[in-house]
Regions:
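Conserved small-residue
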Residues: 260-295, 538-552, 742, 759-850, ...
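Short, small/polar-rich motifs associated with maturation and membrane association
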Residues: 1-351, 355-371, 449, 456, ...
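Extracellular/periplasmic, surface-exposed regions of secreted and cell-surface proteins
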Residues: 180, 291, 309-312, 347-349, ...
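Extracytoplasmic gating/loop element in the C-terminal half of outer-membrane beta-barrel translocons
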Residues: 612, 876-966, 970-971
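Short aromatic-centered micro-motifs
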Residues: 34, 46, 75, 183, ...
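Glycine-rich, aromatic-lined ligand/substrate-binding cores of catalytic
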Residues: 849-882
Length: 1017
């Protein structure tokens, strides 16, 4: 009994002690923000003073830590002054950190993944946070950067979800090569293949296989650094001649386990549509709408055709670890129903990254990524294979619902269903529902990526690092067409089965040294890299000839059976001549060094030498390019007062090569498409004296921050000259070849980029941040190859072409025009129609340049307590837009203009009257291969729009301490403040050179409204 009593008393005393101990500790949570910017700070060190008890703020700036009333919390962050807060009985402690004017600024990820302080850079570089791409998401995340950086131009393809985008820094430089920048993920260059992007042709049906940006989960992105000039990206060599986009993905933070969930749902509707007449009916065998006036208005068939699109973008991530081991895992998926019926897109992304210490000075990391994309009925610009042609051109007064529900009928002569339409012989347009169900393009893409690195800190100043990454892409494209597709062109059907494989193995070794001697500092890196790229492409292609008898004459033995055996029996084209296998290798050595004096003067030197397999058969198999730059922090050399936090002048000069297209220096044999088993010899002479393109780049500018970092600005002037361009010219007759390659040409770009921002924290509850950026680019063709009397055509369509001439600019547009008399009035022929002039350069008219000279963006963000309001207005001035869609609507009599003209009974042009049908069937496009007066269908590209708008609220500690939910109403492409073109000037046919600003039945750009949810634990 006494023993039990003793144990009871002991347990009671222990319990009281423990209760007292626990009563002395409690959990403190809070939010840490930048006082000047108002933004949450990620990765702030929060510790209990004098102890090892510490944590870090999460991706939303929140923290949670166990404390006692007598404790003092210490908050530390790079570039900010330390802060201390006494705990007492407080359970929520929010902190505003003040920028440290004495410390160097933000860390910037530069070429090869080398991190440097922004103040030491000798060239222009801008870093944007992950919030810029995941607050208002785009399926292709690069589109979320539109208008947010000076000098960055992004033009999405008109192919809908999963499509690629044209990305351009500082104008077009290369005439025959790519003008896209290099994409770098975590310091390593990635494959940027775009498989089958739309080319510059009217017919269409080309596939947009997407780009690497469309495979990235935006919620995995920590930051993006834009290296716009050659000096910034020179260490990457030829592949980065057009600049580089450095993407840093998220990693786990030591001592913190976090779970983040994101869900973004939007509804999409067409932002802008053509205007149609609904008063005059069809005629001419169910093709055109030049018939009599209807007794009642017709439906707007285009509005009937489109539906409200739906997109959901979800992701979840788990991250955690300690000082010795950290891991990050994420999964993201996208599902989209497009604005056109039967159009779907889905994608899955898996990402994992682990890093750990092997020893105290050896660090290892591994990463693995997988993405899968699937699309069905992806839009394709052009006349053929495009359901929009039927939806737009169907004769007014047609029973739309009948053809929608009965898009096919049985044909006993062929023994199968065939297309049912107002005119089944017309190749240019067909029943859109037949196309969506019986000409269905299906695309699937898999992308695998495995990488790793090892870093050894030999001394505090010296380390060596090795990295390797393997990537593989697998693309499969099927586009089978059932019997009667494209009018009578494929009466028994067509098979197309395309497979494209790409592999890249990259590796490098870097030695890094960093040391300070008194006022002097040296940062140096030397290394070597190799890149091995291999691609293969097989295209099974079978097509039938015109149907000539009930027995099924033609090349297809049985209709609608899409197998090689069915085509083998009556073979026309079973292997496309584009079937190929390529392999390329690039080895390089490089070095860069920066010398600093008193943290105020910095000198940069870098050099790289490439050995490319594409130059193996030339007189020189390598090319060398250097760069030099300097920056001076004037505020550290000259007293400027406390209001000047930074005033820096910088300048750089560099020479960067642009790699040579594969097989240009050596003969290449190919399969002959029209003779199975035969080999086709090349018709171009090998380029044995080949030299790589070289871009000479000069830039200088200044950066500044004032008034305790409230005001910041940046200005850069640049000038680039790209020489040794590649041209194909006629070969001497005696050579037996048709063409030969030569080096020639000089394309110059010069202009400026500027940005200014103001960041004001009015009080603890209210903050405002605004930024305005603007860029100007002037392009000039200084030299072309000799003997081009009529210039060089880089893109052409029916009655229009883009031509380069010495003294002209990249993107100069020439169009067909009507004949005029001495007084400038239109000339009539005997039939009362205008007279079209020819399509020679002497007859065509210069219509302006398709590229805008000025681009701008203006961002505003307001924080009030837990509310956040932000919007982006952007636009461009200049440029021209060509709309073959409008020309065709006129030629077919379905545009609003043609209806108004018939109501008026005439068309008056410069004082000359024409009958509406006589005028519009001549100047408009009455068939996809008929000439028309393109001069009337060129519009100004200038436009200003509300690009983004969001209003959000953060529910703090909703599910416990530090567990927050942020909900935001979001909108994208809301409306135009100004626009001249009848289509979206920023949507293009493809990513190739010279096809931006062209509308040939492009999918309308979308206006999206939705909800974004973010939950963090």
């Amino acid at each position: 009994m006494q023993k039990k009593l003793f144990l009871t008393v002991v347990m009671f005393l222990i319990g009281m002690l423990m209760t007292g101990a626990y009563a002395q500790t409690h959990t403190v949570s809070g939010l840490v923000k930048d006082k000047e910017m108002g933004d949450p700070l990620v990765g702030v060190s929060v510790s209990v003073k004098g102890t090892k008890n510490a944590t870090m703020t999460d991706l939303n700036g929140n923290y949670t830590i166990k404390t006692s009333p007598n404790d003092i919390l210490v908050f530390k962050y790079v570039g900010m002054k330390d802060a201390e807060e006494s705990v007492g009985d407080r359970k929520i402690i929010n902190v505003l950190l003040v920028p440290n004017a004495e410390s160097l600024g933000e860390v910037v990820v530069t070429a090869m993944g080398i991190k440097r302080q922004s103040e030491t850079l000798t060239y222009s570089a801008q870093t944007v946070g992950g919030k810029d791409v995941n607050d208002i998401k785009s399926i292709n995340m690069i589109n979320s950067l539109q208008g947010k950086s000076a000098g960055l131009q992004i033009t999405p393809n008109s192919t809908g979800a999963g499509g690629s985008s044209k990305i351009l820094f500082r104008g077009n430089k290369s005439i025959s090569g790519s003008n896209q920048p290099l994409i770098v993920i975590d310091g390593v260059p990635t494959m940027t293949n775009i498989t089958g992007a739309q080319s510059s042709e009217d017919y269409g049906g080309k596939r947009d296989g997407g780009d690497v940006m469309s495979t990235i989960n935006p919620d995995d992105i920590a930051s993006i650094t834009l290296l716009k000039g050659a000096a910034a990206s020179a260490l990457y060599g030829a592949v980065a001649a057009n600049g580089a986009i450095m993407i840093t993905t998220k990693s786990a933070m030591a001592g913190k386990v976090s779970i983040n969930v994101s869900s973004n749902t939007t509804m999409e509707t067409p932002m802008i549509m053509p205007k149609f007449q609904t008063m005059y009916g069809g005629g001419d065998e169910g093709t055109y709408s030049w018939g009599d006036k209807l007794s009642s208005k017709s439906k707007n068939y285009a509005e009937e055709f489109f539906r409200t699109g739906f997109t959901t973008n979800n992701s979840i991530s788990l991250a955690g670890g300690n000082d010795n081991f950290k891991a990050y895992f994420s999964y993201g998926n996208v599902y989209s129903q497009g604005m056109t019926p039967e159009n779907t897109y889905r994608s899955h992304n898996l990402n994992s990254k682990v890093d750990f210490k092997v020893l105290d000075n050896i660090y290892v990391d591994f990463s693995a990524k997988y993405s899968n994309q699937y699309s069905k009925n992806q839009a394709a610009a052009g006349y053929l294979w495009n359901p929009l042609t039927g939806a737009y051109l169907v004769p007014r007064g047609t029973d739309w619902n009948y053809y929608k529900e009965n898009f096919e009928v049985y044909d006993p002569s062929r023994g199968c269903n065939v297309q049912n339409w107002t005119n089944t012989k017309q190749q240019q347009f067909g029943n859109p529902y037949w196309m969506l169900n019986r000409q269905t393009p299906i695309s699937e893409r898999n992308r695998y990526e495995f990488g790793g690195s090892v870093k050894w800190d030999i001394t505090p100043d010296l380390n060596i690092q090795g990295r390797m990454r393997y990537e593989r892409g697998e693309d499969h494209f099927i586009h089978n067409a059932y019997a009667s597709s494209v009018g009578d062109y494929y009466p028994m059907g067509r098979m197309k089965n395309n497979r494209y494989f790409s592999n890249q193995l990259y590796g490098d070794v870097l030695v890094n040294y960093n040391h300070t001697w008194g006022d002097w500092a040296l940062t140096a890196t030397a290394g070597s890299s190799f890149t091995k790229t291999k691609t293969s492409h097989v295209d099974l292609w079978g097509e039938g000839t015109k149907f000539t008898s009930p027995a099924g004459a033609g090349n297809v033995y049985y209709p609608n059976i899409f197998t090689p055996n069915n085509y083998y029996k009556n073979m026309s084209r079973i292997f496309d001549d584009d079937a190929f296998e390529t392999e390329k290798r690039l080895n390089a050595v490089f070095a860069t060094a920066q010398v600093g004096f008193k943290e105020a003067v910095f000198l940069d030197l870098s050099a790289r030498n490439d050995w490319s397999s594409t130059l193996a058969f030339t007189e020189s198999c390598s090319f060398f390019y250097p760069s030099v730059g300097a920056s001076v922090l004037l505020n550290k050399l000259v007293p400027m007062g406390e209001q000047v936090n930074l005033f820096k002048f910088r300048g750089s000069y560099s020479i960067v090569g642009n790699d040579v297209p594969i097989y240009m220096s050596n003969l290449r044999y190919r399969f002959e498409k029209d003779s199975p088993g035969a080999i086709k010899a090349p018709d171009k002479a090998p380029f044995r004296t080949l030299k790589p393109e070289k871009t000479h780049s000069l830039e200088f500018g200044f950066d500044g921050t004032f008034f305790n970092n409230r005001l910041d600005f940046s200005f850069t002037y640049y000038k680039t000259n790209t020489k040794n361009q590649f041209f194909s010219v006629s070969a001497p007759y005696e050579s037996g070849l048709r063409n030969r390659y030569v080096n020639a040409g000089n394309v110059q770009n010069q202009g400026f980029e500027a940005s200014v921002g103001w960041h004001q924290q009015f009080n603890d509850d209210f903050a405002w941040s605004t930024n305005f950026n603007i860029s100007y680019n002037e392009n000039k063709i200084k030299e072309l190859v000799e003997g081009l009397e009529n210039g060089l055509t880089i893109a052409s369509w029916q009655s229009a072409k883009v031509v380069l001439n010495e003294g002209g600019s990249y993107g100069d547009l020439y169009v067909r025009q009507i004949q005029r008399d001495a007084d400038g009035k239109p000339v009539k022929n005997a039939d009362g129609k205008p007279v079209l002039m020819g399509d020679s350069m002497e007859d065509m008219k210069y219509a302006g340049n398709m590229n805008a000279k000025v681009n701008f963006g203006w961002t505003n963000t307001f924080h009030y307590k837990d509310f956040t309001l932000s919007f982006l207005i952007d636009g461009k001035f200049g440029g021209r837009v060509l709309s073959a869609t409008e020309a065709t609507l006129d030629g077919w009599g379905v545009s609003e203009r043609t209806g108004d003209a018939r109501n008026a009974g005439k068309v008056v042009v410069d004082g000359v009257e024409f009958a509406p049908q006589a005028w519009y069937t001549t100047v408009g496009a009455s068939n996809f291969n008929s000439p028309y007066a393109t001069e009337f269908y060129v519009y100004k590209g200038t436009n200003v729009r509300m690009r983004e708008l969001s209003l959000g609220y953060t529910f703090r500690n909703l599910f416990g301490n530090g567990k927050n939910l942020t909900a935001a109403l979001i909108a994208r492409n809301l409306f135009f403040f100004y626009k001249d073109a009848p289509c979206d000037p920023d949507v293009s046919m493809g990513t190739g050179n010279g096809v931006q600003g062209v509308d040939i039945f492009n999918l309308p750009s979308s206006r999206s409204l939705g909800l974004n949810l973010k939950l963090n634990f």
